[in-house]
Amino acid sequence: MSIPLAIRAAFWIWFFAALFVGRFLLLQKFPPPAGQGVVLALTAALVLTYRHAAAFRTWVDALDLRAIVLFHVTRFVGFYFVFLYRRGELPYAFAVPGGIGDIIVAALALVVALFSFGEATRLHAIYIWNVIGFIDILLVVFSAVRIALAGGGRELIALTQLPLSLLPTFLVPLIIASHLAIFARLARARAVT
């Protein structure tokens, strides 16, 4: 099996494991902030794999930066956060600031990735977008930790059920790790010039 195929297979296995966790409500079996602990552990695993597994790092670094940025359109999930707040299923302190921040980051990802820029301008735009997106996702995670600890996890129960359980078990670790990979790529590009 080729390295790229093995990496894709690993991601599919991880995705199906995340679906399993959500389907059987496994995050509910642990005290808060277990979901955020899962985010931390999975992000650390991705970062360590990127740092120490040359084949994985080569595969990630071969991806077009615009493709990595476009992955962040998944952050339009922020609209769903706001919708769930309006239905009373997520607290304002998490859903509205986090949702609006994610919507902005997703919209900016489209601009940065799809608009016609010169290479230097694109790299600068990606850097600015990456800083904004990274800060936003960290604020969302820290907000979730604070709310989970203060309320015993009841306010964020929606994050333990599908489809939102895919956030801590799959999507958010990929988002954080992708921001770190973009920072690494941009630093190397800057060092070359």
What are these regions (language model features)?
Residues 1-11, 188:
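N-terminal membrane topogenic signal
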Residues 12-23, 36-52, 110, 134-141:
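Hydrophobic core of alpha-helical transmembrane segments in multi-pass integral membrane proteins
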Residues 19-29, 81-90, 144-151:
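Juxtamembrane "helix-exit" motif on the non-cytosolic side of transmembrane helices
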Residues 29-88:
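A glycine-rich, hydrophobic loop/mini-helix early in the fold
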Residues 39-51, 104-113, 167-185:
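Hydrophobic cores of alpha-helical transmembrane segments in multi-pass inner/ER membrane proteins
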Residues 49-63, 111-127, 147-152, 179-193:
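Juxtamembrane membrane-water interface segments of multi-pass membrane proteins
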Residues 70-123:
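Membrane-proximal helix-loop-helix units in multi-pass membrane proteins
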Residues 149-167:
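Short, membrane-exposed interhelical loops at transmembrane-helix boundaries
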